[in-house]
Amino acid sequence: MIGLVVILILLAAFYGGSRRGVALQLVYSGGFFLSFLVAQKLFLPWGERISLLLPYLSVSPDTKMALFTQEQSFDLDKAYYAAVAFIGFLFIGHLLTKFLGIFASGLRYTRFIPQVDGLIAGFLNVIIAYIWIFLIFKLLTLIPLDAIQGLFKAGSVPRWIVEKSPLLANYFNQMWIIDLI
């Protein structure tokens, strides 16, 4: 079921991007990746600050984490706060980009290569949507609730996305798990 939802989100993202056209989608994509770089620089100090404001569920010796060992699960609060800070900065930057994109809406009708303009723009938007899906699933892996951890049982789509996504899986595992725990 979750796999179907992911596919529908990616199809909707492709449709939205292809309707925008490459010129406008490049504005949105550039803003997203600029926000990504800002979030990458700021998430660590802010992750420590929000730990005082945002509660993290306590991990008990009986807690079963789908993707982490028992030892790692006791230190996942650091990774959780870092992930929340990163996603928060990325979300704020994405909203600012969407707002600024309103002023660039005239680019919607600018076509670089009319034959493939929609395909390129749709593909760019799918990449952004996939990154969001990955980040949400990665954040969920850090929450020690059985119902949420059940989403990541062996062979599930969310688990595959979190573990096997090219570039993203290793990058965020290094940034949020290995470097912090």
Range-by-range predicted roles:
Residues 1-181:
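Alpha-helical transmembrane segments and their juxtamembrane interface "caps"
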